[in-house]
């Protein structure tokens, strides 16, 4: 079972977002739109951060389709950065939270975002409008034999390059945004 995720994240402006939407309507396919509420939890018995940057996270995601529990371990030492990701559907957010709280976890933050998801060749990408943060684009390589250059080739059509990638997770971006 493959649980390795290779994706690049870009902070984008409204112009790039509109250009992307116009172009992808010609080249790719809109997979769907959704509203996501992501609640992140931190344990009181282990540090999920190194030097203030998140390297592990537990998240409960609420969508129109249901509730999903996820664990991610970010490998920042790797090039490109990737993470191990494990997800499972849960029937009750409240019960899952009770389990996490009983194990010594507390809520770190809640992130509210609207997402439009697209497919283009071997790529899947999401355009997110994140409350209190702004616009983000995540591009994920779906072919394990694919090369990260496929992502750079795609984003270059919109004036983005390797220098525009943010290696910070959404939790770190949100923390910085809220402290401004």
Set out the residue ranges of the language-model regions:
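Mixed-charge, glycine-accented linear interaction segment located at domain edges/termini
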Residues: 144-169
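Short beta->alpha junction loops/turns
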Residues: 13, 142-144
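N-terminal strand-loop-strand beta-hairpin
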Residues: 1-122, 160-180
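Strongly charged, low-complexity linkers/loops
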Residues: 124-130, 135-136
């Amino acid at each position: 079972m493959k649980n390795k995720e290779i994706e690049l994240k870009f902070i984008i402006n409204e112009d790039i977002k509109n250009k992307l939407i116009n172009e992808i309507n010609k080249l790719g396919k809109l997979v769907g739109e959704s509203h996501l509420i992501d609640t992140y939890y931190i344990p009181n018995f282990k540090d999920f951060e190194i030097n203030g940057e998140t390297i592990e996270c537990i998240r409960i995601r609420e969508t129109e389709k249901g509730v999903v529990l996820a664990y991610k371990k970010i490998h920042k030492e790797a090039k490109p950065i990737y993470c191990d990701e494990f997800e499972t559907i849960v029937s009750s957010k409240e019960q899952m939270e009770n389990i996490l709280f009983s194990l010594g976890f507390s809520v770190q933050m809640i992130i509210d975002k609207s997402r439009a998801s697209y497919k283009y060749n071997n790529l899947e990408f999401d355009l997110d409008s994140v409350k209190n943060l702004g616009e983000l684009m995540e591009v994920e390589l779906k072919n394990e034999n694919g090369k990260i250059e496929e992502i750079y080739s795609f984003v270059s059509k919109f004036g983005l390059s390797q220098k525009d990638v943010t290696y910070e997770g959404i939790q770190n971006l949100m923390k910085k945004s809220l402290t401004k």
